[in-house]
Every structure is written in C-alpha cells, then in structure tokens.
C-alpha cells in the first residue's frame, strides 16, 4: 500500500536535493526477512554503542519500528543501520523497508551523505566520510559545504584530520583526544609522542598549542634533559636489555655506579663519582 506521508518523510531524512536526483520509485513499504538486509560497508560510522542499540531495541519491542529502513535494489542499507541492528538484537525476523531504485554508486553516495549529517558521529568518522566523498565522488570542500550545510572551514579542518597517524585517529574515535588537540598535531613529526603526553597530563587545547609552539623553538628537543616536560617527552619508557647489560659491564669495570638515560633523540651515559680522586681514576681509565 502506498503511504502518502513517505515522500515528505524521506525528504526530511535525505534532503530535497537527494529526492529530486533519485530514479523514480514507488516508495511502497514492504515487509522482508531481516537476514536479507546488508549493512553498507562504506558507511562512516564504525562504532555502535551497545547500550544505545539496546535502548533502541527495547523501544522497538514496545512500540514497533515506526520508521521503515531505506535499502537499495541489492538490499543494502541506505539509511537506518542502527534501527536494523536494534531489530536484530530484539530477534525480530521481519521488518518494514522502502526499496529505492538506485544503482550502486547512487546508493553509496546517498548513504554517506545521510550518515554524515547525523550529529552522533565522532569527528574522525565524519572526516573519513568527507575523504571518501572527495576521493570517490569528485566533491570539493566547497561542494561538500554547500551540500551538507556546513562551513567550508569545518570541512577543510576535518579533511586534514585524515593526515594524522592512525594511533591519533583512534584516540579521536575513542574521544580521549579532542579535535582541537588533534589539529595542533597535524603533520608534526612527533605527533604521537605529544599526543600521549597531552593525554597523560590532561592538557587543554591552549596548553597543547603552547607545547607545540615551544617544541618548534627547540626548547624540548635540543636539551630534553634540562626540563621536566622534555624528560617526560623523550625518555624511553621501555627497558632495553642491551643497555642494562652495558650498565652492568661499565659499573663492574670502573667499580662505580653507572646509569644510562635513553631518549628517542639520543641519550646520556652518566658516571657517578664520590670525589675528585675517583673522577681522576675514571678519566685515566677512559684515556
């Protein structure tokens, strides 16, 4: 049966421009087996919180699935993956869908646009979605901004996040690092070292900007052992068995305490002497 409200509902969901560019379809709600439906592998959302899916699942059990899932001719989801997951969790075998008459490329583009417009994506999921649209659908930052109703600077800033090391992208996905922090680290040679320090010391964005500024002036890299931050940034956290063996050999040879401080950009070999006489003895041995 044709639902008179579906045209307006889909327009609200996907936008007037999307509707006008789609091929004609009857927009008939059909009931199909849930196992025939496939998630969209290119959708930007990669993290689905179980608690929120469970909450939606309970709501669907109590009230039914009020909004049909939108799929294409291959039964791949265009819009509604959270609802589909919630229905599977609720062990619902058949669900209402609207099948859109789209080819694979059109389906993928609309699915990406629809998901990117959601407010609960992480900034990194949004950034990856922008990148995919730019690389596969010839979007520019200007065109994306116009299509999504976002500022060009927002689009450009998020696209740049894709240049970050994967470990920092993961921190953005986990919300352990904010977009403001991450922007300070783009294209920085030691971004991962700084990111770990920022998280360990709970620095705000302004403090992170100052840290990066001082770094650029070689305040930490030139003399890392002369300040607390430099030491924490550059000192290796892992024990090196070869270095420990060397410490033992040198200590036994000179009969004094010897330590080695190993940094990512170098290190120090330290002889601990009691008095000048012992220092003279060390220097004589070294010569």
Curated annotation (Swiss-Prot):
A GO cellular-component term linked to this record: chromosome
GO molecular function (one): DNA binding
Alphabetical UniProt keywords: Chromosome partition, DNA-binding
Gene3D superfamilies in UniProt: 1.10.10.2830, 3.90.1530.30
Source taxon at top rank: Bacteria
UniProt KW DNA-binding keyword: yes
InterPro entries, per the entry: Chromosome_partition/occlusion, HTH_ParB/Spo0J, ParB/RepB/Spo0J, ParB/Sulfiredoxin_dom, ParB/Sulfiredoxin_sf, ParB_dimer_C
GO biological process, one term: positive regulation of sporulation resulting in formation of a cellular spore
Name of a matching Pfam family: ParBc
UniProt family annotation: Belongs to the ParB family.
Function: Involved in chromosome partition. Localize to both poles of the predivisional cell following completion of DNA replication. Binds to the DNA origin of replication.
Protein name per its UniProtKB record: Probable chromosome-partitioning protein ParB
Lineage: Bacteria, Pseudomonadati, Pseudomonadota, Alphaproteobacteria, Rickettsiales
The encoding gene: parB
